[in-house]
Amino acid sequence: MAPERLEVLSTLKEITGFLNIQSHHDSFRNLGAFRNLEVIGGRTLTEYFASLYIVKTSLTSLGLRSLRKISSGSVAILENEELCYAGDINWTQIMRSQVHNTLLQNNRDPGKCIAGGAVCDKQCSSEGCWGPGNKMCLSCRTYNVDEECVPSCDPNLGLYEAGKEFISTLIILGQTTLLTSLIYASAFHFE
């Protein structure tokens, strides 16, 4: 199956069972089709007790930028010769089960990833990333604006920094209204 046919899954937010990826296709480079996947439930698991099982693929990065929770089951990412970034992810932030482990073996050598520039963006926190760019961070080093990690507020975008808060201006029917929104490194919330 051609990877672009997976785009039908781009609005998927939750898988109650497991995600099993075992495909080697030259143009299958990441799991971007699952970019909105937030939760893998693990109600049913693979025969290896995994809820995320990625084996012998042509992936270079995972691209699961919205994944925030694996309720049950282990993570097994094995024998993906071109895959970088998976070893940099702090899986304990995502996995809720204390009895399941993370098994990452025989993926691309981390030294080769670094030499090839396949490293997390400098705006990502130490939690890791799903792939290249400042939209693939597990969490941001400083600020998150519209799902993009940024080092500071940009006044040209109508964002102004006030301590750890952003002040944004909105123009409504010619009137300017100031809204204060608190940002604590990862949430953009208007009050």
Residue spans for each PLM region:
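Functionally engaged cysteine thiol sites
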Residues: 84, 111-120, 153, 172
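Short, recurring structural edge motifs at helix starts
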Residues: 23-25, 63, 122-129, 135-139, ...
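Residue-level signal for mature regions of secreted extracellular proteins and peptides
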Residues: 70, 76-77, 106, 113, ...
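Short, disulfide-bonded extracellular cysteine-rich repeat modules
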Residues: 132-154, 161-170, 179-187, 191
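Short intrinsically disordered, low-complexity coil segments enriched in acidic
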Residues: 1-6, 120, 124, 149, ...
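Concave beta-strand-loop units of leucine-rich repeat
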Residues: 1, 7-33, 38-59, 63-83, ...
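Short, flexible/disordered secondary-structure transition segments
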Residues: 44-48, 147, 160
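Beta-strand cores of modular interaction/reader domains in eukaryotic scaffold and signaling proteins
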Residues: 20, 38, 53, 76, ...
